[in-house]
Amino acid sequence: METTLRGVGVSHGVAIGEVRHMGTAVLEPPAKQIPAEDAEREQGRARKAVEAVAADLMARGNLAGGEAQAVLEAQAMMAQDPELLADVERRITVGSTAERAVYDAFAAYRALLAGAGEYLAGRVADLDDVRNRIVARLLGVPMPGVPDSDEPYVLIARDLAPADTALLDPTLVLGFVTEEGGPTSHSAILARALGVPAVVALPGAGEIPEGTVVAVDGSTGEIFVNPAEEKKARLAAEAAERKAALAAATGPGATSDGHKVPLLANIGGPADVPAAVEAGAEGVGLFRTEFLFLDDSANAPSEEKQITAYRQVLEAFPEGRVVVRVLDAGADKPLDFLTPGDEPNPALGVRGLRTLLDHPDVLRTQLTALAKAAEGLPVYLEVMAPMVADRADAKAFADACREAGLRAKFGAMVEIPSAALRARSVLQEVEFLSLGTNDLAQYTFAADRQVGAVSRLQDPWQPALLDLVALSAEAAKAEGKSCGVCGEAAADPLLACVLTGLGVTSLSMGAASLPYVRATLAKFTLAQCERAAAAARAADSAEEARTAAQAVLSGE
């Protein structure tokens, strides 16, 4: 009998196949005592296991590249946290085995994270994955993770750790479903980068029996369990039709009446450039630079290293536009040499531009490296600061850019409601705005992007969020400046039309989403997009906003 479940669709496409479940977590090691003379040996075992797991995570990151690399390197740093390792060794000194000491030390750290506010609580899944890998290595048992299979399947898991998502084989994993996570969680972002259909925040998904045939619609968030043959045929036909439409949609982004909407790519480093170029990106709307800093959390990368990496990306887009976000450290991206380790709530503390203004030498080096990397290249370089709260922040960043001799446009990311509410004031100091809708939603609704329980409030269709987008776009238009969106909202083809109708001047997303957005925009006029935007803003919920916009664009 066919049943329908609904979660949150986070990566486009349809997948039909049999269910396979993620490998179970490592069992809790027994709490047996060791003789005092064995303590040194056990400490050595623990250190070797930690080093091996950290090296494995780094290797997976190097293989995956791009955004996945940054996430996995952050996990490797978590495994090697000095305070955590000291706690492991202390527990061994008082009689614990290496595996039990790791298990208990991570449990204590887990409790700290879980109680440190929702932002850091979202890191718990990553921490659990690191713990399981270290304990599995010490016990000599298989690592938890993606099941082995020679046949394609739909993967179901409570949540997917970055180390697993990054190396999913799209030829075998047709799609995946998780019980936890949200539209801007690591799993969702990496799924879009892979082009794998995915649905998250579906409680009870783990109860679907192994081997059951399901159809996953990553656009609507629907899961059809034991779908009828007619349903499978219809979904497959719709998927084939969409694929043909995508192949036919080429060229610059524009509405059907010729209103230009540049479609840009979000990238996490040079490794993401080929996919962006292949997908027809007109440039880069968000170049995350954290990957350069995660290699060594104790020291900033040299100016020379930064110049090399930046130039690789700039050279790939001759006559194109490349928007670079300066280092966004703090909160879920802590760096030993920059971020304080004892902040009670890092998400609301010193992060983003605040961190850089406290360490002007780091900002100066990065801006100087960008200036030198762009020398002699026919590229339109733009540089923006994360976590700009007001005009004073914008002025401090613009002044730093000028002092570094940077010949580029200076911009501000709108991730804090205050920046949207006072966008016209901010624009007195900078030349463009870029809306980071992931964090803007998080701070608007007090809803952590990694916590599945509040994913409803992370939905970029929330009318309050659309109001803030409209405020920013209207301010930019009044000042004769640009206002783009580089958050995951831009990757939703229908929402991309609404954002265009709100006055957004460019859209930036993962490369895999570019064809979907290009094809959808080309179906509608600017006037239709504007009517859809007005209908969405008049709604009272995210679901109503989507339905209202869809009704306008479908002519209902």
Swiss-Prot record:
This is Phosphoenolpyruvate-protein phosphotransferase. Its EC number is 2.7.3.9. General (non sugar-specific) component of the phosphoenolpyruvate-dependent sugar phosphotransferase system (sugar PTS). This major carbohydrate active-transport system catalyzes the phosphorylation of incoming sugar substrates concomitantly with their translocation across the cell membrane. Enzyme I transfers the phosphoryl group from phosphoenolpyruvate (PEP) to the phosphoryl carrier protein (HPr). The gene is ptsI. The reaction takes place in three steps, mediated by a phosphocarrier histidine residue located on the surface of the central domain. The two first partial reactions are catalyzed at an active site located on the N-terminal domain, and the third partial reaction is catalyzed at an active site located on the C-terminal domain. For catalytic turnover, the central domain swivels from the concave surface of the N-terminal domain to that of the C-terminal domain. Belongs to the PEP-utilizing enzyme family. The N-terminal domain contains the HPr binding site, the central domain the pyrophosphate/phosphate carrier histidine, and the C-terminal domain the pyruvate binding site. Mg(2+) binds at residues 415, 439. GO terms for biological process: N-acetylglucosamine transport; phosphoenolpyruvate-dependent sugar phosphotransferase system. GO terms for cellular component: cytoplasm. It is an enzyme of class 2 (transferase). The keyword Cell inner membrane does not apply. GO terms for molecular function: kinase activity; metal ion binding; phosphoenolpyruvate-protein phosphotransferase activity. Phosphoenolpyruvate binds at residues 288, 325, 438-439, 449. InterPro entries: PEP-util_enz_mobile_dom, PEP-utilizing_PTS_enzyme, PEP_util_AS, PEP_util_C, PEP_util_CS, Phosphohistidine_dom_sf, PTS_EI, PTS_EI-like. SUPFAM superfamilies: Enzyme I of the PEP:sugar phosphotransferase system HPr-binding (sub)domain, Phosphoenolpyruvate/pyruvate domain, Phosphohistidine domain. It catalyses: L-histidyl-[protein] + phosphoenolpyruvate = N(pros)-phospho-L-histidyl-[protein] + pyruvate. It is found in: Cytoplasm. Homodimer. Its cofactor is Mg(2+). The active site is at residues 186, 486. Keywords: Cytoplasm, Kinase, Magnesium, Metal-binding, Phosphotransferase system, Sugar transport, Transferase, Transport.
